[in-house]
C-alpha cells in the first residue's frame, strides 16, 4: 500500500517498500529492544494496552521488526482516536478489522460519504415537487437514489467489518442511519416500481447521511450541544407557555365580547395571537381593537410583553448561556482526559521490555511514520527534542503527554540575520534599515490611522452628495488617486522595510494588501469605464477596519469574530439541516396551496390579492406578493423558511396556509419557530461564551501572548544531524528524508556552523487558552482520573492478557472510556 500523503489520515496498513522501509532495531541512536509481550503493555497509570500481535503468553510469531511495526501502527491509531474523540470500544480488534478501519479512515472514503449524502439531498431539486428547470423523470431520480443508497450500504458494511456486530449495534448514530437507510430503500423501490411519487415525508430524514459524514463533525457537536441544552430550555419554555395560556384565557374573557376584535374571538385564536405577539410580528395590531374600545386594555398587553418577552425570553437566554458554559467546560475536560488516556495506551505500546521507563528516538520515529506520514525526518527529530524536556535519551510519559501540541508545530530554520537586507552593501543597508525603523515606529502607524480616518470621512461626505444612485462617475475622483497613492507608498515601504516574507506573515498586512489591490483594480475599472466592475470601488471603505487595531477591546472583538468563523459555519450548516427537514415536510403538505387570490376568506386576504383592472387607458396591477412565499419546491421553501426565521409578518404566511388547509397547520409553523429559537439561542450563547472567555483570558495574560501564536525554539547540533542521517542511510529510509537531511548538513557546512536553530510555530487554539484558564483545576482532574483508573483496575474492568490467540488476531482492547 502507498503511504497516505495527508496528516489528517496518517494510518496505513503497510509501507511501500520502495518509499519507506521499516526501521527494525539496530544499535544506532537509541538501541532498540524487543517489544514487551502483548505489545509492550506496561502498567501506565494502571492501564494495559493489548497490541495487534500475538497474545501475551505466546512468543511473537513474526520477526521483531514486524512486531514493532504493528505496535507503531496501533499506537498511532490510539493517538488518532484521542484526537478525534473516538470511543476506544471502536478500536479495531484484529487484522481484518484493522484493514476495514484503515479503509474507512481515509479521505477517499470521507469524500465518498460526503458526495453520496449531497447527492441524496440534492435529489429534492429533481423529485416532485421539483424545481421546474431541474425536473427529472421518476425513473431517473429513483435510480440515482437507489445508487446512492447502495453506496451507503457499502459504507455501513465496511463499518460493520471494522466494528463487529456487537459494537455496530451499540453505536447509536450508526443504528439511526441504518434505520433511515432501510426506510429510504423501501420507498425508493416503491417509487421505481410505481413510476410515480407519493407522499414521502421521510425524505426529511436524509440529513442524517450528511450529519454522519466525517467532514461534518462540527454539525454533530452542535446537535449534541443542542440536545444537552434542551432540559433547562424546556423548563423555561414550559414556564413561558404556561403564562401564555393564562393570558390567553384572561384575554378571551376580557375581549371576546367585542365583535370587532377577531384576535380573541375563541380560545384558540387567543393562544395563536398571543404566540405571534411573543415575536412582536402582530403588535400593535392585536391590541388596537380592544384599545379603541377601552384605553385601559393596553395594560394587559404591556404586562404580557413585559413578562413573556422581556423577562422570560431573557431568562431563557441566561439559562442556556449558563448551561452552555458548563457544557463547554465539561467537553474540554472530557476531551483532555480522553487524549490523556489515548497517550497512555500509545506509550504502553512503545515501551520495550528492557527499557520500560521511556521511548527511544527510534520508537518515536516509528510512531510518527504512521501518525504524521508527511513529516520529514528532520521535523521528527525536532519534535522529539521539543518533547524531551528532561534531556535524556528516553522520552518519559510526562514528556509524551504533550505529543498533540508539539506534533502540530511547523518547523523552519531560524534566520541567522535579523533582517533580509543585512548582507546588502552598506549604502543599501542603511537605506533599508531607515525604512524598517520608520515603518515600525508608532508615529508612522498613527499617521496611517489618521489617513484612514480622513479617507473614511471623505467617502462618507462623497456618498451623501450623490443623488439618485448616480455613483458611476465617468471621471476618476482626485481624492481616490491621493489616498490610493498613500496606501501604495505604505505598502511598498513595508515590503522594503520588513521583507516580503515577514510582511506577508501578518494577517493585518495581508488585509491591507488585499484592500489596496482591490482599490487599484477599482481605479482601472473607473479609468477604462468597465461598468460591470464598478462594484470593486464600493470596497474602499474596508480600509476603515484597520482602525479596530487602535483599541484593545476592538481587537478582542475582531479576534473573537475570526475565531468564531469556522464554528459559525458549522452552526449555519446545522440550521440548514433543520431548514431542509422542515422544507421537505412543508412541500409534502402545503405544495400548491398558496396562489394569487387564494385566501380571500381569511384575515390576510390583502397580502395574497392579485387584481388586474383598467383605469382609463392604463392597466393597473395590485399585488400582495405573499403568494410568492410558498412551498412549491425546495428553493422556494428555503426562502419561505428564512422569512419565517426573521419573524417579521411571519403570521401572514401561517394564516394563508391555514386558510387553505386546516388549523392544525399552525403546529408546523409554531414548531419551526421554537426549533429556530433553540438554534438561535445556542448561537447567541456560543458567541457570548467565546467573547467572555476571550476577555477573561486577556485579563489573565499579556496582550502580546494572546495575539501571538505558540513558538518553540530548538537547536540541532551537527553531531545529532549526522547520527540521524546515518540512521536513515543504514535502514534505507526514504530518499526524500535523506535528501533533506543532506541539504541541512550542507547549509551548516556552508556557513561553518556547528549547530542550527529551528523555530516551531503554530497558531494558538481554544484548547491552548483553556489549558491556561483552567490550569488550577486541570491537576485535580488528572488526579481524579488516575483514581478512577485505579478503581477500575481493582474492580477488574481491565483484565489481564488473554490466552494464546491465533496469529494475526489479538484480544479485545480494554480501555478506560
Swiss-Prot record:
Gene disruption phenotype: TPCN1 and TPCN2 double knockouts are viable, fertile, have no obvious morphological abnormalities, and no obvious behavioral defects. After fasting for 3 days, they are less active and endurance performance is reduced by 8.3 fold in contrast to wild-type littermates that show no changes. Two days after re-introduction of food, mutants regain endurance and become as active as before fasting.
GO CC annotations, alphabetized: early endosome membrane; endolysosome; endosome membrane; lysosomal membrane; membrane; monoatomic ion channel complex; recycling endosome membrane
Ranges in the topological domain labelled Cytoplasmic: 1-113, 159-172, 222-235, 320-445, 502-504, 551-569, 693-817
Alphabetically ordered keywords of this record: Calcium, Calcium channel, Calcium transport, Coiled coil, Endosome, Glycoprotein, Ion channel, Ion transport, Lysosome, Membrane, Repeat, Transmembrane, Transmembrane helix, Transport, Voltage-gated channel
Entry's transmembrane regions: 114-134, 138-158, 173-193, 203-221, 236-256, 299-319, 446-466, 481-501, 505-527, 536-550, 570-590, 672-692
Glycosylation sites: 470
Intramembrane: 264-287, 631-654
GO terms, biological process: endocytosis involved in viral entry into host cell; positive regulation of autophagy; sodium ion transmembrane transport
Signal peptide stretch: none
UniProt biased composition (Polar residues): 26-51, 806-817
Top-level lineage group: Eukaryota
Coiled-coil annotated spans: 770-794
Extracellular compartment residues: 135-137, 194-202, 257-263, 288-298, 467-480, 528-535, 591-630, 655-671
Tissues expressed in: Mainly expressed in epithelial tissues like lung, kidney, colon, spleen and liver (at protein level).
Topological relation to the membrane, as annotated: Multi-pass membrane protein
Transmembrane helix recorded as keyword: yes
Region (Disordered): 20-65, 785-817
Processing after translation: N-glycosylated.
Subunit structure: Dimer. Interacts with MTOR; the interaction is required for TPCN1 ATP sensitivity. Interacts with STX7, STX8 and STX12. Interacts with JPT2. Found in a complex with LSM12, TPCN1 and TPCN2.
Similarity comment text for this entry: Belongs to the calcium channel alpha-1 subunit (TC 1.A.1.11) family. Two pore calcium channel subfamily.
Entry text on domains: Each of the two internal repeats contains five hydrophobic transmembrane segments (S1, S2, S3, S5, S6) and one positively charged transmembrane segment (S4). S4 segments represent the voltage-sensor and are characterized by a series of positively charged amino acids at every third position.
Name recorded for this polypeptide: Two pore calcium channel protein 1
Lineage: Eukaryota, Metazoa, Chordata, Craniata, Vertebrata
Gene name of this polypeptide: Tpcn1
Amino acid at each position: 500500500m502507498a503511504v497516505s500523503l495527508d496528516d489528517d489520515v496518517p494510518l496505513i496498513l503497510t509501507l511501500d517498500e520502495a518509499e519507506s522501509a521499516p526501521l527494525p532495531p539496530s544499535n544506532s541512536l537509541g538501541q532498540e529492544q524487543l517489544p514487551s509481550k502483548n505489545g509492550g503493555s506496561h502498567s501506565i497509570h494502571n492501564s494495559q494496552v493489548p497490541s495487534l500481535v500475538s497474545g501475551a503468553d505466546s512468543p511473537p510469531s513474526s520477526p521483531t521488526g514486524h512486531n514493532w511495526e504493528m505496535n507503531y501502527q496501533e499506537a498511532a491509531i490510539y493517538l488518532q482516536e484521542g484526537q478525534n474523540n473516538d470511543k476506544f470500544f471502536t478500536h479495531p480488534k484484529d487484522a481484518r478489522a484493522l484493514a476495514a478501519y484503515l479503509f474507512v479512515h481515509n479521505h477517499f472514503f470521507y469524500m465518498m460519504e460526503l458526495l453520496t449524502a449531497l447527492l441524496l439531498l440534492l435529489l429534492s431539486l429533481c423529485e416532485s415537487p421539483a424545481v421546474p428547470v431541474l425536473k427529472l423523470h421518476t425513473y431517473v431520480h429513483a435510480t440515482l437514489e437507489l445508487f446512492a443508497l447502495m453506496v451507503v450500504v457499502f459504507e455501513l458494511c465496511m463499518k460493520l467489518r471494522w466494528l463487529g456486530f456487537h459494537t455496530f449495534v451499540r453505536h447509536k448514530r450508526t443504528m439511526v442511519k441504518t434505520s433511515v437507510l432501510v426506510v429510504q430503500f423501501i420507498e425508493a423501490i416503491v417509487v421505481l416500481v410505481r413510476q410515480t411519487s407519493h407522499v414521502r415525508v421521510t425524505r426529511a430524514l436524509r440529513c442524517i447521511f450528511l450529519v454522519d459524514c466525517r467532514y461534518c463533525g462540527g454539525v454533530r457537536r452542535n446537535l449534541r450541544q443542542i440536545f444537552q441544552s434542551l432540559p433547562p430550555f424546556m423548563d423555561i419554555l414550559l414556564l413561558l407557555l404556561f403564562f401564555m395560556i393564562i393570558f390567553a384565557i384572561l384575554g378571551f374573557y376580557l375581549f371576546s365580547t367585542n365583535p370587532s376584535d377577531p384576535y380573541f374571538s375563541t380560545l384558540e385564536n387567543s393562544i395563536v395571537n398571543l404566540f405571534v405577539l411573543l415575536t412582536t410580528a402582530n403588535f400593535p395590531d392585536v391590541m388596537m381593537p380592544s384599545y379603541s374600545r377601552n384605553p385601559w386594555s393596553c395594560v394587559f398587553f404591556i404586562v404580557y410583553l413585559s413578562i413573556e418577552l422581556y423577562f422570560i425570553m431573557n431568562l431563557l437566554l441566561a439559562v442556556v448561556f449558563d448551561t452552555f458554559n458548563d457544557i463547554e467546560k465539561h467537553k474540554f475536560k472530557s476531551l483532555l482526559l480522553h487524549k490523556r488516556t489515548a497517550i497512555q495506551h500509545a506509550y504502553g505500546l512503545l515501551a520495550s521490555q528492557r527499557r520500560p521507563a521511556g521511548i527511544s528516538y527510534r520508537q518515536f520515529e516509528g510512531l510518527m511514520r504512521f501518525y504524521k506520514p508527511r513529516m520529514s525526518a528532520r521535523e521528527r527529530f525536532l519534535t522529539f527534542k521539543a518533547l524531551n524536556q528532561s534531556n535524556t535519551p528516553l522520552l518519559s510519559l510526562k514528556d509524551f503527554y504533550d505529543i498533540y501540541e508539539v506534533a502540530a508545530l511547523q518547523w523552519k530554520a531560524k534566520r541567522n540575520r535579523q533582517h533580509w537586507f543585512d548582507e546588502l552593501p552598506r549604502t543599501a543597508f542603511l537605506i533599508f534599515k531607515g525604512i524598517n525603523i520608520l515603518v515600525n515606529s508608532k508615529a508612522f502607524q498613527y499617521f496611517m490611522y489618521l489617513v484612514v480616518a480622513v479617507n473614511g470621512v471623505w467617502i462618507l461626505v462623497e456618498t451623501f452628495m450623490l443623488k439618485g444612485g448616480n455613483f458611476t462617475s465617468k471621471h476618476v475622483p482626485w481624492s481616490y488617486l491621493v489616498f490610493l497613492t498613500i496606501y501604495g507608498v505604505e505598502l511598498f515601504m513595508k515590503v522594503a522595510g520588513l521583507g516580503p516574507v515577514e510582511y506577508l506573515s501578518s494577517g493585518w498586512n495581508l488585509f491591507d494588501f488585499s484592500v489596496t489591490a482591490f482599490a487599484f483594480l477599482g481605479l482601472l475599472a473607473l479609468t477604462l469605464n468597465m461598468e460591470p466592475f464598478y462594484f470593486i470601488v464600493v470596497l474602499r471603505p474596508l480600509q476603515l477596519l484597520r482602525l479596530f487595531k487602535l483599541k484593545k477591546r476592538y481587537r478582542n472583538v475582531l479576534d473573537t469574530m475570526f475565531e468564531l468563523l469556522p464554528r459559525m459555519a458549522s452552526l449555519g450548516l446545522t440550521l440548514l439541516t433543520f431548514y431542509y427537514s422542515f422544507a421537505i415536510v412543508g412541500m409534502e403538505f402545503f405544495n400548491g396551496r398558496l396562489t394569487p387570490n387564494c385566501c380571500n376568506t381569511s384575515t390576510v386576504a390583502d397580502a395574497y390579492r392579485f387584481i388586474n383592472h383598467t383605469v382609463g387607458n392604463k392597466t393597473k396591477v395590485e399585488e400582495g406578493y405573499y403568494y410568492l412565499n410558498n412551498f412549491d419546491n425546495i428553493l422556494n421553501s428555503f426562502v419561505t423558511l428564512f422569512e419565517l426565521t426573521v419573524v417579521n409578518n411571519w403570521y401572514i404566511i401561517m394564516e394563508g396556509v391555514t386558510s387553505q388547509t386546516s388549523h392544525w397547520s399552525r403546529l408546523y409553523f409554531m414548531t419551526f419557530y421554537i426549533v429556530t429559537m433553540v438554534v438561535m439561542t445556542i448561537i447567541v450563547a456560543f458567541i457570548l461564551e467565546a467573547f467572555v472567555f476571550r476577555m477573561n483570558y486577556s485579563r489573565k495574560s499579556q496582550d502580546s501572548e494572546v495575539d501571538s501564536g505558540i513558538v518553540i525554539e530548538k537547536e540541532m547540533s551537527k553531531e545529532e544531524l549526522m547520527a540521524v542521517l546515518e540512521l536513515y542511510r543504514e535502514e534505507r529510509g526514504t530518499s526524500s528524508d535523506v535528501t533533506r537531511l543532506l541539504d541541512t548538513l550542507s547549509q551548516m557546512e556552508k556557513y561553518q556552523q556547528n549547530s542550527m536553530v529551528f523555530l516551531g510555530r503554530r497558531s494558538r487554539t481554544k484548547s491552548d487558552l483553556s489549558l491556561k484558564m483552567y490550569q488550577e483545576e486541570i491537576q485535580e482532574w488528572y488526579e481524579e482520573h488516575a483514581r478512577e483508573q485505579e478503581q477500575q483496575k481493582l474492580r477488574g474492568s481491565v483484565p489481564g492478557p488473554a490466552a494464546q490467540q491465533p496469529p494475526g488476531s489479538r484480544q479485545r482492547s480494554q480501555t478506560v472510556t
